[in-house]
């Protein structure tokens, strides 16, 4: 009954209590499978009176896989000897009222999901696990089945036949179960190998969990599963060659990780430390606008030296700005749910309720088992199959398509696919079908083919050869009230080709958030923002009102409310004639004009810095 799009039921703690009072019982489950965290039933026992109870499904699951139950000791007495480092929960009670229940939930260190409880069938008190393989996006195979139940509290594993026979009897609803699992597997055919764990209830079954890195069955596994795994092992041995160069690269990375752990600021990711060091080295060699002493002064305080001109840095004001190293250190600001937007294919799946704000997704191109495989995505028109022939037929119909990395940023790896006058063009260069096929087969990462977006006619006048996107930085600290903190327009030029990256020679213009007025266009020359009021290629003055501005602001904030788990996002927006489209979402966007950040935006970063410093017990950060 809860609307995950409109949130009509409500989404704060009072609404949760109202739902709990209506239902009488809810389950609070870890947001991901864990051997050390369990689920609890929250049960209403009277007026403003609640208790935490054992979830039998969770107990069965953890007993089956040999883990202790309730390692937080919330449902049992503390033992005389607690595990090393264990801290007693000060909010533990036998019974809770509304306030004390909130205090208890607030002590949970990890993510949990409050859900409708389901009861395991007394006739089948166990878990069925199915091993599934998706081969080259085309075929779904169910490789093996085994059932684990509890007989007097002890786990007992038994094989299940492909026809659903267990101990000589066929499992009820088997055909429906297999059809459901097969349909789900086909829908997510990008996942090559996984298991689905099924729990039987009195009125059917539920899929309790999906594991993309499963252990082997505890019983003798089927010939089909064995053949599949041995085939994949043989393929990997043939395709993966450990050269001296690869070995040396892996050794250097391992050594670098040790260096970061022992000599760099606690909490920084090795990848971000490497980026920072590369940026410093590049700045040291190529920035001719600062002296060596100025460079060293900046590096010691966490800034790249060109920030002296950009921010007007001095020894008196440098602490007023978020430094480059601090921003590297903060990564990642978002939690693990950032996986929703780490790649465009996943984003399309997650954003189904808001698909009108995305480009139409036509094809996925993935390397699987050493071959280039193609999947038709949700928005593909009828009559186009998942093949190169289908891609070329769609291109001939649409005339323009976008080909881009599923997880790319900055416009890197973007290709403009065009069909005009009987010829195929890639980024303006004529190519044959065979040439395009060879180019795509050479891709090592996942690519997507989407509709080619056309910007609003008013913005097209400024520069027609790129989309001229709007960057919208949003902070959602409370999960309920997302706020747009910074907006600016990026405009392409002859230096950027079909993209509008400011760092590659593009132009940026400020946008007034309340009104949508864009003005004060600038471009970066020698690391310094330089006025550029007129576009150098078209001669058009860069000033006006962004079309569909209010519609865009509402759409973006609605989307942020839809995924309140993420609190810091950067949207790249294409304004179109009839609305807007999201090109990509950044989880740790590039810093832009920190000197012009609002006080509220600065306060957000200060709070994040203080929180991380507390986590790592740092006094200086």
Name each region found by the language model.
Residues 1-38, 321-413:
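A conserved helix-loop-beta module that forms one wall/lid of the active-site cleft
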Residues 24, 32, 37-46, 50-159, ...:
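Phosphate-binding site of ATP-dependent enzymes
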């Amino acid at each position: 009954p809860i609307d995950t799009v409109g949130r009509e039921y409500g989404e704060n703690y009072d609404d949760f209590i109202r739902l709990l009072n209506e239902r009488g019982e809810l389950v609070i489950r870890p947001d991901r499978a864990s051997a050390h965290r369990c689920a609890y039933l929250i049960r209403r026992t009277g007026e403003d009176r609640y208790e935490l109870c054992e979830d039998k499904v969770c107990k069965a699951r953890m007993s089956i896989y040999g883990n202790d139950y309730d390692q937080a000791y919330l449902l049992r007495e503390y033992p005389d000897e607690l595990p090393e480092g264990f801290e007693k929960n000060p909010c533990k009670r036998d019974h809770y009222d509304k306030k004390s229940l909130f205090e208890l939930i607030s002590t949970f260190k990890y993510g949990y999901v409050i859900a409708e409880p389901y009861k395991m069938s007394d006739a089948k008190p166990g878990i069925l696990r199915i091993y599934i393989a998706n081969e080259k996006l085309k075929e779904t195979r169910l490789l093996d089945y085994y059932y684990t139940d509890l007989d007097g509290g002890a786990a007992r594993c038994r094989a299940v036949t492909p026809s659903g026979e267990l101990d000589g009897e066929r499992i009820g609803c088997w055909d429906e179960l297999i059809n459901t699992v097969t349909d789900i597997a086909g829908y997510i055919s990008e996942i090559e190998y996984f298991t689905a764990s099924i729990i039987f209830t009195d009125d059917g079954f539920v899929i309790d969990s999906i594991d993309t890195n499963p252990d082997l069955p505890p019983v003798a596994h089927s010939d089909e599963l064995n053949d599949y795994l041995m085939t994949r092992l043989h393929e990997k041995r043939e395709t993966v060659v450990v050269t001296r160069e690869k070995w040396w690269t892996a050794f250097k990375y391992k050594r670098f990780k040790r260096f970061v752990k022992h000599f760099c600021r606690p909490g920084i990711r090795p990848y971000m430390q490497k980026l920072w060091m590369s940026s410093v080295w590049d700045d040291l060699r190529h920035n001719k606008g600062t002296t060596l002493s100025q460079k060293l002064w900046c590096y010691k305080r966490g800034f790249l030296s060109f920030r002296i001109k950009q921010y007007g840095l001095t020894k008196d004001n440098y602490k007023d700005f978020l430094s480059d190293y601090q921003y590297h250190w903060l990564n990642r600001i978002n939690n693990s749910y950032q996986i929703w937007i780490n790649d465009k294919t996943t984003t399309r799946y997650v954003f189904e309720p808001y698909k009108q704000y995305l480009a139409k997704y036509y094809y996925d191109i993935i390397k699987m088992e050493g071959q280039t495989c193609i999947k038709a995505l949700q928005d593909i028109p009828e009559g186009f199959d998942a093949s190169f022939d289908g891609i070329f037929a769609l291109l001939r119909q649409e005339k323009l398509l976008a080909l881009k990395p599923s997880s790319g940023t900055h416009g890197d790896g973007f290709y403009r696919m065009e069909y005009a006058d009987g010829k195929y063009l890639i980024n303006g260069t004529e190519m044959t079908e065979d040439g395009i096929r060879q180019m795509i087969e050479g891709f090592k990462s996942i690519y997507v083919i989407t509709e080619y977006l056309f910007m609003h006619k008013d913005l097209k006048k400024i520069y027609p050869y790129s989309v001229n996107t709007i960057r919208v930085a949003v902070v959602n600290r409370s999960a309920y009230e997302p706020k747009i903190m910074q907006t600016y327009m990026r405009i392409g030029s002859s230096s950027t080709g079909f993209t509008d990256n400011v760092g590659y020679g593009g132009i940026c213009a400020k946008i007034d958030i309340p009104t949508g007025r864009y003005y004060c266009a600038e471009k970066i020359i020698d690391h310094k923002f330089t006025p550029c009021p007129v576009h150098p290629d078209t001669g058009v003055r860069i000033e006006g009102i962004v079309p569909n501005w209010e519609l865009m602001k509402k759409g973006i904030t609605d989307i942020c409310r839809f995924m309140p788990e993420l609190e810091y996002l950067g949207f790249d927006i294409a304004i179109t004639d009839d609305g807007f489209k999201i090109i990509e979402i950044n989880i740790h966007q590039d810093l832009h004009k920190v000197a012009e950040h609002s006080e509220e935006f600065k306060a957000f970063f200060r709070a994040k810095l203080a929180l991380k410093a507390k986590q790592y017990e740092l006094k200086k950060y």
